[in-house]
Amino acid sequence: MRSGAERRGSSAAAPPSSPPPGRARPAGSDVSPALPPPAASQPRARDAGDARAQPRPLFQWSKWKKRMSMSSISSGSARRPVFDDKEDVNFDHFQILRAIGKGSFGKVCIVQKRDTEKMYAMKYMNKQQCIERDEVRNVFRELEILQEIEHVFLVNLWYSFQDEEDMFMVVDLLLGGDLRYHLQQNVQFSEDTVRLYICEMALALDYLRSQHIIHRDVKPDNILLDEQGHAHLTDFNIATIIKDGERATALAGTKPYMAPEIFHSFVNGGTGYSFEVDWWSVGVMAYELLRGWRPYDIHSSNAVESLVQLFSTVSVQYVPTWSKEMVALLRKLLTVNPEHRFSSLQDMQTAPSLAHVLWDDLSEKKVEPGFVPNKGRLHCDPTFELEEMILESRPLHKKKKRLAKNKSRDSSRDSSQSENDYLQDCLDAIQQDFVIFNREKLKRSQELMSEPPPGPETSDMTDSTADSEAEPTALPMCGSICPSSGSS
């Protein structure tokens, strides 16, 4: 059940806060300001610029979805396309529906796979921009990680492919919006709801640890809700893989959510940091959801050395009205010393404040969330669609025509080297090294491999059936058995 505190105050969307925080990466520390604690009379902290922001128009998701379904019905007399199973997935396999978001160097839109009519989110990243911003390595690392993992509380990768301009990732479509969006809409999250998010993230982080992965960017912006209100972790762009006994050392993450040991390692050297940093970030996120601002007043302009000093001198202030159980849980997550911090699923399961949690039910999404996003709305900024249609110099919906023109232009050019040899070399390297991935095909392959071999009676039956059928049906389906080269 939703508590009254978790209902929006009005039908009009609240003014948006400033853009989501930037991230510190191994090559730098470009991060956004934290939310400073407001005066006691203020109901909720706002990012800088709120006073100038205009209310967002509501996007009527239910009406749009109905219109799309009617469009499908009107063209439903035509058969679904059937793609050759031996063919690699590509841009033509998807119908672009609308833009829903953008990141530092990529954009996201809703797509529908033409043959199955399943809906996904598709993130696409311009190759040239990635090269110019030195982001290619991060994209490849994210793909490497996402192709190897799958979990109920992660945003899972289904397909990856490329064309001359862009790299594409097709992932789970979650229509409930991210937690940053709901903070900006002034949603008042109850303790029960925040506790559920903490537990769902605990299951996700426990799985990532089993795969030797540190996410390094857990924050409200990267936690998406599904239509039922369950939390899913996304964006592995600065995640890292560490083997047994190894430690990470790079300054990477979003400053207000980065654990103290990351700054300490950067300033003083030492042994580095490990999986505990993600659990600190969960604590910061939970505190922010409950109070409206973060436990430490950290800005992008803060020197790393000053942050090391801050964590040793400033203590977190907890609201007296919060329950003792919630305060105890937050204290364990926000412990400065990583050795004493909650940093494993076992720690959580043995915590007195979580003794009532049914972890098996939780992992199967049987626990009903306290906050359920409004199903009649698309929980994103509708101006993304306008930007894509009007301001974008290379809009996605005109890609086929643009690529056809480029091919025609390229064929008529002189074969001499272009002036930008370096850029072309980088583009060629991406084209060669990019790994195409198809989880749908991989799952079919695994299902076929797991089927038990037929017994003698079954074998006889199969043979007689095959003899009575047309010859093509007796042939082995090589395309459905053999996954693409990127599926392993």
Curated annotation (Swiss-Prot):
InterPro entries: Kinase-like_dom_sf, Prot_kinase_dom, Protein_kinase_ATP_BS, Ser/Thr_kinase_AS. ATP binds at I100, G101, K102, G103, S104, F105, G106, K107, V108, K123. Residues 397-406 have a biased composition (Basic residues). Its EC number is 2.7.11.1. It holds the Pfam family Pkinase. Residues 24-33 have a biased composition (Low complexity). The keyword Ubl conjugation does not apply. The active site is at D217 (proton acceptor). Keywords: ATP-binding, Kinase, Magnesium, Metal-binding, Nucleotide-binding, Phosphoprotein, Serine/threonine-protein kinase, Transferase. Residues 94-354 form the Protein kinase domain. The keyword Nucleotide-binding applies. SMART domains: S_TKc. The modification Phosphoserine is found at S10, S17, S18. It catalyses: L-seryl-[protein] + ATP = O-phospho-L-seryl-[protein] + ADP + H(+); L-threonyl-[protein] + ATP = O-phospho-L-threonyl-[protein] + ADP + H(+). Its cofactor is Mg(2+). This is Serine/threonine-protein kinase 32C. It comes from Mus musculus.
